[in-house]
Structures are given as structure tokens and as C-alpha cells.
Amino acid sequence: EQVDDEMNNNMDYAAMSCQNCLSDAVDILTVNYFTVQYMHESGHSMDEFRAYFTEQTDYLKNEESMQYLGIYGYIDGELMLSTAWEQPEGYRIEDRSWYQEMKQNGTELTITTPYLDMKTNRQVVSVGRMFRDGSNLIGVDVDLEELSDLLKELDAGTGEIYIVDQTGSIIAGGEPAYMGKTLDSMYHRTDAYETY
């Protein structure tokens, strides 16, 4: 019974950590969304946007947590990142799954399906939102590998702790090779795990 209590406490902690990370990202996005949209409507320059994204990303890394890779925007057809990144030849933001999900949801808040970030080669989700004009957006990338590291530290007894998305795909926990796989495909049965 003591083992069950400890495992339940660890699962509570894991669930709360994930929820806190995502709700913090939503709060960060909300504050910056209105600021950046105002900057755009007021005619700020691209250099001012770059400086703003860099300043906000530095704040996140220094004051908040490294779970956030940065704040970015897609402003007037230009991808604005807080650090330099050479886009690969043929790169089109419109082809990226995270952009398509945000575009589909319009001004509604979007937490994207996990994807491999091309700049950092890390598994992330984006928390983002389109501007009222329907073509510009702002987002915050959340590093899922840090959540995985946190889950690895928790004692799950003889089991393992994973975070799965709505499709049943693993987005955090376990080995990096597990990312994107479904529990069903790993265990070849549906009763091998419990959801929490």
C-alpha cells in the first residue's frame, strides 16, 4: 500500500508539472500576444520585433525555466526567432504542421501536436495563436525533453510514466526513441497500461 501511495504521489506530481508547464506557457503567450499584435498594428520595424523576441526569450531562460525554448513570431511573411537560424532551402512555414494547426484554429489558443523542432532538433509543442488578421502569429515552444527528464526521475515502481497526446502517442517520458510511438504499438496490447 505504501508503494501505491508513493506511485500515486509521483503521478500526481508528474501531472501537476505538465499542467504547470503548459499553463505557464499559455500565460506567457497571452501577455506577449497582445503586446506583439499592438506592435504590429502600430507599425514597428522588423528589427524591433527581433529585439522584443530576443528580450522575452532571454527573460524566460533566466527567470522562468529552460523548458521554454523561446518566443517566436511570423510577422508579415517573415519568421522571427530570438536567435539566428539559417532556414534550409525550400523551407516554407506554411508547410509546417504547427503553422497549419494554428492557422486552422485562428485566434483561438492552440497547443500543437508534438513535433521535432528544426532549429534545435528537440521534441517540442508550440503554444500559439494567430493575430486577428489571420496571417501573423506568435508562439512559445515548450521543450518536451525536459519533461521527459523530470518523469525519468520519478519512481514508478516496476512501471514507467509517460505523457501521451490525444492520439495516444508518447510525447514525454521514457527513452527518446519512444517519442511519437503509441503505447499500443510498444506493448502490443491495450490493457498493459493505466491512464491517470
What are these regions (language model features)?
Residues Q100-F131, T158-Y162, L183-Y196:
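Membrane-proximal, non-catalytic sensory/regulatory domains of signal-transducing membrane proteins
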Residues G73, I163-V164:
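Hydrophobic beta-strand positions
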Residues L81-G90, I170-H188:
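GAF sensory domains
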Residues P114, T120-D155, V164-Q166, I171-P176:
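Conserved beta-strands of PAS-like sensory domains
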Residues Q67, D155-T158:
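Short, small/polar residue-rich loop motifs at catalytic or cofactor-binding pockets
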Residues E1-Q2:
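Cytoplasmic juxtamembrane "membrane-exit" helices immediately C-terminal to transmembrane segments
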Residues Y91-D95, S148-K152, K181-S185:
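A short, polar/proline- and glycine-enriched secondary-structure boundary/capping micro-motif
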Residues D5-E108:
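Extracytoplasmic/periplasmic sensory segments of membrane signal-transduction proteins
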